[in-house]
Amino acid sequence: MTAEKAPSFQELILRLQSYWASKGCAILQPYDVEVGAGTLHPATTLRSLGPRPWKAAYVQPSRRPGDGRYGENPNRLQHYYQFQVLLKPCPTDLQDLYLGSLDAIGIDRDLHDVRFVEDDWENPTVGAWGLGWEVWCDGMEVSQFTYFQQVGGQDVELVSGELTYGLERLAMYVQGVENVYDLDFNGAGMTYGDVFLEAEKQYSEFNFEHADVDMLIEWFKGAENQCMALLNLDKPLPLPAYDFCLKASHLFNLVDARGAISVAERASWIARVRELAKGCADAWVKSERALAEAAE
């Protein structure tokens, strides 16, 4: 870092939002359904499909119940934040745009070693994959960028460029701290731990010890049935159906965190969620094509 004071966690977010807004992105809000990664926000998963261009950026809280450590691990969380950017079609200067965002948050590339390490991305739960790279700053992974090839089992019509910033990890790097809970949250004396440590403790206890497995399994079946019902309408409703696909995915993650799914069963659960995602993607693409044709 330069001599300039490192940005707080919230200032880091504001700078990224301002930067990507200046590049023509719609700055969206977090999706209000639990997701395991920012990519699963419909502004990325669904909007990456179909023929219409799209440029958006947003913060997304992500929940991975099995990653909780009762607030005792300095860099592993069951609830954390990602900053997502989706550019469709992908611009030819995506890498330069990304490097410009590092400048915006105060990383002096003349003083730090920024490298792109090939690492293709795949999310089998939603039938998605793409060609990608991890971005490393001084040996620490801080971002991932991906050229989507397939989402929900559908080949993309326009290749999208997706950027994912791990906000906590990036902030730890920028601020030079070793423990996520020591992060300067707002530049006014509040730390990340002041905001989130108690939640990490309580949700870890819930995820591993108290989540009612039988109830969660019934909820999973209900979400699965509702998703399929919405997709089987004469005029399918892919957006609300996708909400229930996301709910099913999160419920699976909770049951998995409780240790209630065997290795053999796990593949079956993932396949069920993937089928929901594929159904949502198929219905979305059909609706997008119809809208594009109507606009011609």
Swiss-Prot record:
It is an enzyme of class 6 (ligase). Keywords: Aminoacyl-tRNA synthetase, ATP-binding, Cytoplasm, Ligase, Nucleotide-binding, Protein biosynthesis. One of its GO terms (cellular component) is cytosol. GO terms for molecular function: ATP binding; glycine-tRNA ligase activity. It is found in: Cytoplasm. PROSITE patterns: AA_TRNA_LIGASE_II_GLYAB. One of its GO terms (biological process) is glycyl-tRNA aminoacylation. Its EC number is 6.1.1.14. It catalyses: tRNA(Gly) + glycine + ATP = glycyl-tRNA(Gly) + AMP + diphosphate. Belongs to the class-II aminoacyl-tRNA synthetase family. NCBIfam families: glyQ (TIGR00388), PRK09348.1 (NF006827). Tetramer of two alpha and two beta subunits. PANTHER family: GLYCINE--TRNA LIGASE, CHLOROPLASTIC_MITOCHONDRIAL 2 (PTHR30075:SF2), GLYCYL-TRNA SYNTHETASE (PTHR30075). This is Glycine--tRNA ligase alpha subunit. It comes from Maricaulis maris (strain MCS10) (Caulobacter maris).
